[in-house]
């Protein structure tokens, strides 16, 4: 793989810090550098984003690994992840847009995983406040208004211990032709009753508090009605996860995440079109169906009304397939956008085969700029033989419809803990990490 001269030049003049930060910088800094290099980011933008990553992300990743077992299992990356507090996304380019790179982190601090911070909120809120003070485009008005509505009101100690875990994540998008870093926050209600009240009580009140009593809730109400009255929409289940943009109030979006266990493509297309309310051409739906079947290892001739074949775990039990979506709510728009997530972490298709299927799709339809660059990134982060034979590098592909084409994003993991001993073996059997 080609060298990374910009990463090397930036690293040369960085001050020495503790071994934890040195570890995370050498590992994740190189990952970020590789992604920007392959995506064709301008050199000055690469330097800017690398410095942001070093000083505004790396210090929040906590202690470096000392075994293959995480001291705190982060929920970043979902079921495919190994507990590492960071993962990445690569939004494929279009004919007129370069790929966009993001990372997602669960900030870890001195109070993480202690009784003082059961929901791991302290480090995240401190990081968001720091971003608001140093990034001129970051505005936390919506976040600070929404956060109290999502925080559980738990009194009993046993309940708090049972529901402890991540309640906040942070995403940072580094567009190639921008001078800003766009920040997103993700909130996770920990109490099941909160999730059931999300569309009827929590979100309407939070949006009125944020935007004013006269805020237009047409888009939110459409989602609620679709999930209540539509035969297809009523099969959706709220996860409780809500994403918001940390920017000026008039530009913010609220993303509501749901899942379905119906895997027929007729059902998937009905959700993408909101039961016909969002027109999507037959050509694009056909493209999505082909990609859906290929990534899920389903035969191409499977009728669109049929469920995907059940997937079997190594122990012989069945692995249920869950399909996530999100609805993109904006008060100024009456109709929400919809995005589907294709989980490849449990698919019978290997990570490398899945990645190549997406690249073939993009090349066949003339989408994206140099999609092969994405394969270079994956093969730099994870050896080819592991991409061919093991799972865990890839988490999801998301698919939306933008400007009459499929807008595809890949979410993938650095596998810091899972590959810990593999690196030791590579160093001639020495009992230390290859990252040391």
UniProtKB/Swiss-Prot annotation:
Alphabetical keyword list: Transferase
Pathway involvement of the protein, from the record:
Secondary metabolite biosynthesis
Gene Ontology biological-process annotations: alkaloid metabolic process
Q: Which domain of life is it from?
A: Eukaryota
A molecular-function term among this protein's GO annotations:
prenyltransferase activity
Q: Which InterPro entries does UniProt cross-reference here? A: Aro_prenylTrfase (IPR033964), Aro_prenylTrfase_DMATS (IPR017795)
Does the entry feature the keyword Transferase, yes or no? Answer: yes
For this protein, what is the EC number? 2.5.1.-
Q: Which family does it belong to?
A: Belongs to the tryptophan dimethylallyltransferase family.
Functionally, this protein is described as follows: Prenyltransferase; part of the gene cluster that mediates the biosynthesis of neosartoricin B, a prenylated anthracenone that probably exhibits T-cell antiproliferative activity, suggestive of a physiological role as an immunosuppressive agent. The non-reducing polyketide synthase nscA probably synthesizes and cyclizes the decaketide backbone. The hydrolase nscB then mediates the product release through hydrolysis followed by spontaneous decarboxylation. The prenyltransferase nscD catalyzes the addition of the dimethylallyl group to the aromatic C5.
Give the protein name, as stated in the record. Prenyltransferase nscD
| Species name | Arthroderma gypseum (strain ATCC MYA-4604 / CBS 118893) (Microsporum gypseum)
Phylogenetic classification of the source organism: Eukaryota, Fungi, Dikarya, Ascomycota, Pezizomycotina
């Amino acid at each position: 793989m080609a060298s990374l001269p910009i990463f090397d030049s930036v690293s040369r003049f960085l001050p020495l810090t503790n071994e934890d930060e040195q570890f995370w910088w050498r590992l994740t800094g190189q990952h970020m550098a590789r992604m920007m290099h392959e995506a064709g980011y301008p050199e000055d933008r690469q330097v800017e984003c690398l410095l942001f990553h070093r000083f505004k992300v790396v210090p929040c990743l906590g202690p470096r690994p000392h075994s293959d077992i995480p001291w705190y299992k982060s929920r970043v990356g979902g079921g495919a992840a190994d507990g590492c507090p960071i993962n990445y996304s690569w939004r494929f380019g279009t004919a007129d847009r370069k790929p966009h790179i993001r990372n997602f982190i669960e900030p870890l601090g001195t109070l993480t995983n202690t009784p003082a911070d059961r929901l791991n909120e302290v480090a995240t809120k401190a990081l968001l406040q720091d971003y608001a003070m140093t990034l001129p485009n970051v505005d936390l008005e919506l976040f600070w208004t929404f956060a109290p509505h999502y925080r559980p009101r738990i009194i009993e100690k046993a309940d708090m211990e049972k529901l402890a875990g991540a309640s906040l994540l942070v995403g940072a998008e580094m567009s190639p032709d921008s001078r800003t870093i766009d920040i997103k926050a993700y909130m996770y209600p920990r109490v099941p009753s909160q999730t059931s009240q999300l569309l009827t009580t929590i979100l309407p009140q939070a949006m009125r508090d944020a935007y004013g009593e006269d805020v237009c809730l047409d888009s939110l109400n459409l989602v609620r009605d679709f999930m209540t009255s539509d035969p297809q929409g009523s099969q959706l289940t709220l996860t409780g996860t809500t994403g918001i943009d940390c920017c000026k109030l008039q530009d913010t979006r609220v993303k509501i995440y749901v899942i379905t266990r119906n895997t027929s493509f007729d059902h998937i297309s009905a959700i993408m079109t909101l039961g016909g309310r969002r027109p999507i051409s037959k050509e694009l739906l056909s493209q999505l169906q082909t990609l859906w079947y290929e990534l899920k290892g389903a035969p191409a001739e499977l009728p669109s009304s049929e469920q995907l074949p059940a997937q079997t775990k190594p122990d012989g039990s069945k692995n249920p397939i869950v399909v996530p979506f999100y609805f993109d709510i904006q008060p100024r728009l009456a109709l929400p956008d919809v995005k589907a997530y294709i989980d490849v972490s449990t698919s019978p298709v290997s990570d490398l085969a899945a990645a190549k299927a997406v690249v073939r799709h993009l090349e066949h339809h003339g989408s994206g700029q140099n999609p092969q660059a994405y394969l270079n990134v994956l093969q730099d982060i994870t050896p080819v033989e592991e991409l061919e034979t093991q799972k865990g590098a890839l988490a999801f592909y998301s698919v939306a419809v933008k400007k009459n084409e499929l807008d595809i994003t890949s979410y993938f993991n650095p596998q810091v803990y899972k590959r810990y001993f593999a690196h030791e073996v590579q160093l001639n059997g020495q009992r230390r990490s290859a990252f040391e």
